[in-house]
Amino acid sequence: MNESYDTQTVNPSIEKYVSASNNGIETHKFTRCVIGYILHGEKYVYYDDKCYKFSQGDLFFLGMGCHYTKNIPAQGHPYEQILVRYTSEELQRILLHLNIAYKLNITNNHQCDDCRTLNHATMPGWSSIRRFFSHIDDCLTEGSLLDDPTAENLKMTVLLYLIVSHGDCCIKSKLLGNVDAARDNLQQIVYSNIFSDISVEEIAKRCNRSLTSFKKEFFRIYGTSPHQWLIRQRLIHARLLLISTDKAIAEIGTACAFPNTSHFIKLFRKQYGMTPETYRNRHRGPEELQPTPQAEAAVRETAVSVTA
């Protein structure tokens, strides 16, 4: 399973990604939030035992942290997407500018289970979004955004305007939910230590919070305790390593920060009802992790409710 890391910069970054082949499931570790648009092909996003399908023409959001994705080229055409990465500070600055300079009243009343539980969102791009990313594609091809942070900031401002002035939806909710810089900092530290051999107390210290304050804020954001959340994230990563690599069980346990193999096997069995070896034997194959009917239905339902 291939891995990529996002290197944080001081400005929003806009880039195009092209892949002519299916590289399988890849791990992406984001230190910034991402808004993306699929020009050609399909993207699959994996979360635990579910798979979510993003199609050509879809606008999507990926929050900070680990994402497991697979990009599928279109028939006779490579997979192409445009990604816009930003921090909460950049988001705050641009939204404040839109509010003060243009009197834009920014509100969001959308709430759903997906917004609360998933670290991504997607919906079909509407006409102004399609035109915007077609223009961005031309700019990237011409190189007019290269080494020009002012141009990137202006494009980011336009994109945010198109989203926040649109009807309430999961992407808008996710976007506005990442304005809090303090929360952003806590999430960055938590995500960067998922596979570190440190205690919850040490993570709280790195967030400049008392253990009690950290646990309270953590529960507000994630709806569970730090210990349970970290174990779940490690098991999710281990499960994908089992079905996408030939690594030994002990090696996977170590890579996912479990103290020993027996402890890893015990927790995995508790979560998935079988040992890692049995899970690998049952689930490896070409049909593994196809989009579930529930996941596809949820995407369609969201699209209908937003565009209706």
Predicted regions and their residues:
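Amphipathic alpha-helices that form helix-helix packing interfaces
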Residues: 129-132, 136-139
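N-terminal regulatory/effector-sensing and dimerization cores
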Residues: 5-110, 145
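Terminal helix-turn-helix DNA-binding modules in bacterial transcription factors
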Residues: 188-192, 197, 201-202, 216, ...
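Short, Lys/Arg-enriched, Trp-marked, Pro/Gly-tolerant hinge/linker segments that flank
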Residues: 108-127, 140-196, 201-207, 220-228, ...
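Short hydrophobic/aromatic patch on the recognition helix
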Residues: 57, 214-218, 263-264, 268
